[in-house]
Amino acid sequence: MMPAIRRLALLRPFMVLCVIVAGSAGLIARQKATAPPVVTADDYARAEKFLGYNTTPLVLRGSVRATWLAGDGGRFWYRNLVENGSKFLLVDPVKRTKAPAFDHAKVAGTLSVAAGARYDATHLPFTQFTYSADGRSISFTVEGRGWTCDVAGSSCASTKSPEAASARKEVVSPDGKLAVFIRHDNLWVRNLATAVEKPLTTDGVNDFGYATDNAGWTKSDNPVLLWSPDSTKIATFQQDQRGVGEMYLVDTKVGHPTLHAWKYPLPGDETVTTIQRVVIHLDGPRVVRLKIAPDQHRGTITDDIKGRSTEWDDVEWSADSRHLAFVSTSRDHEHEQFRVANPDTGDVRDLFDEKVATYFESGMGTANWRFLPATNEVVWLSERDNWAQLYLYDLQTGRLKNQVTTGEGNVTQVVRVDEKQRLIYFIGVGREKGRDPYFRHLYRVGFDGKNLALLTPADADHDVALSPSGSLFVDNYSRPDVKSTSVLRAADGAQVLALEEADLSKLVAAGWKPPIPFTVKARDGVTDLYGLMFRPTGFDPSKKYPIINNIYPGPQTGSVGSRGFSASRGDTQALAELGFIVVQIDGMGTPWRSKTFHDAYFGDMGDNTLPDQVSGMKQLAQRFPWIDIDRAGIYGGSGGGYATAGAMFRYPDFFKVGVSTSGNHDNRGYEDDWAEKWQGLLVKKADGTSNYDDQANQNHAKNLKGKLLLAHGTMDNNVPPYNTLLVVDALIKANKDFDLVLFPNRGHGLGESYMIRRRWDYFVRHLLGAEPPKEFEFHPRPIAPTGGL
């Protein structure tokens, strides 16, 4: 028998081998467990499926966009996206019918013959048309050529297609006979019947022209004015930019570049753009100047003197064209004066004013006061009780008669005022307990504040459109995770006709899943914040996912945007598809909540809602174990680009990767109206510092620890690229590694495929820890129009 010790000696090499093999197996197992994820071109292609140009066409009968017809019957047509194309439908509320607006097949056939092209019933070459007065024919334009077809489709004939007033940069008079436009800094009028043109003003010169809105980031030759109802007068202004500082951009090309210069006042500038209000009488013509000092180039809404059209905001004519009401806004947006002018003499009467400690707003996108000379009243919107409420003033005395709306929640838009019935129709948010406070609802209330009625009952976000008479409205309602339903309602909210219900079958078949709404607590631990979460469609709760914040900090809007249904919200779902959790959170300092909520970071723009973003993301990680909070990223554009870089500098241990595009990184280099409203007037102290120093990202760049990609268009005339270059310079001086992409001759948006791909690559490489497919190529396609657009 072999001694035990010898047996052990002989077995030792085999034991060592077994240990080595076992150890190697364990190492291999550990390496497999920690192996970086693999991201392929197929993964990118799958993610691309969830970009808007792929998802939008998959939603059929998405919503109703009514084109109302003349008359009291409330008839309207809309265009609907259907299987394999689109069709036009005509709604008759009196008959309670919904039928084809014309014979699609026959119109397609006769038009094909007349135009020498090939069309079919669901692929007609137009998206808009007008009925003839008798309703027997339709007129439309195809590639600049006018056509008229009878609704039965028996004939189609080519017609002259006059250039649209908008294309000519004109504003047509209410009676449809005249069009006003700018020529060489003066206003001219054109007779639409005779084409005869004549000047209305002659003293306009460079930097002191009429009706122009070329101030700061706004550059347009569209005249800003308001015709009187009787088409005899025009309310406008002479804009004074003499001595105002300029902004400069240089294009990129072979040979000598072109220098682009325009007036662009900045915070703290002694001389900024002002306007001198005038009324132009077409008889003569003659110009009546209002007898007041020049007004600031300001309005009661975000950062311009006009809304989404060329109409001048904060100006209203009386129905008889004898009186002109307007609001003068101080440079710091803290003081508003309601005034009424005599357009014949230029005399101005100050009726009442309002002062606030931060900034005044009368709405989002459109001013929400109403001039009611027929009843000697003014409807005024104010946040004096911490919510956007309506108030009724006496037009003769300027005294407050009564508060119209009360309680929590905001009036966001006055959509109709019925002086005869003494009723106000308005869009409100946050007024229904237990519902998302961002959901819009339509309400009706009496001038005296009594009989408040909810007209859109569904627990959803309501996108409404009233008929010209106000007797009907189209109600499109949905939620981020619930498809759209469209109905026609009477003025009292009663349903008249069911119109459409969105069909998501194609979208769902493509793998789409809705975002997940959530709530978290704000920085104060008390206030509820609302957001959306996007997960990979192949989500596995046993895995750990990095989290990415898609941010827009406001202050004029938030990260989430619409609370209605959308097949795509930027590239949030597409990015999530690569192996991330993507979130959007509306933090404190964004609108549509209380005034206190909106004022949260007034005077401290560097805040950018970041304390709320960090707090919210941490809460989500505690709630959901599949979120890896140690791998947090952030991205955004414009204000979101500003916030992204700020996040990387102010929270360097939390945010590991950021992609910042087109950021206004130092608001001293962004237009005056924006910054002076949200940060306050620039105040320089005796020691050389100012109240704007801390908001400047370059002053915090030395704190960078993570991976940061900066991008900007070199011809960005909204946020000039020097904002990003200030940060670049600071990072270089601090010896920090970073990445930079400049887009030659590009403007502000940077929504092109190359930027999307670079953003995806950056997060995949630095946050996910994988190597992205090399130079993946997107294949965008034109977005098919949605129903009614």
Briefly describe each language-model feature range:
Residues 2-15:
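Bacterial N-terminal signal peptides that target proteins for export
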Residues 10, 26-484, 488-489, 499-505, ...:
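Beta-propeller folds
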Residues 246, 292, 312-313, 321, ...:
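Serine-hydrolase catalytic core recognition
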Residues 12-24:
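Bacterial N-terminal signal peptides
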